[in-house]
From Swiss-Prot:
KW Ligase (keyword) present: no
Gene3D superfamilies, alphabetized: Ribosomal protein L33 (2.20.28.120)
One cellular component term from this protein's GO annotations in UniProt: ribosome
Keywords assigned by UniProt, alphabetized: Ribonucleoprotein, Ribosomal protein
Name of the featured protein: Large ribosomal subunit protein bL33
UniProt keyword Ribonucleoprotein, yes or no: yes
Gene: rpmG
Family of the protein in this entry: Belongs to the bacterial ribosomal protein bL33 family.
Record's signal peptide: none
InterPro entries (UniProt xref): Ribosomal_bL33_sf
Amino acid sequence: MRELIRLVSSAGTGHFYT
């Protein structure tokens, strides 16, 4: 579930991991 990681990362750091 890489999308979940992206969402959490985005919410936590402010940028997306692709």
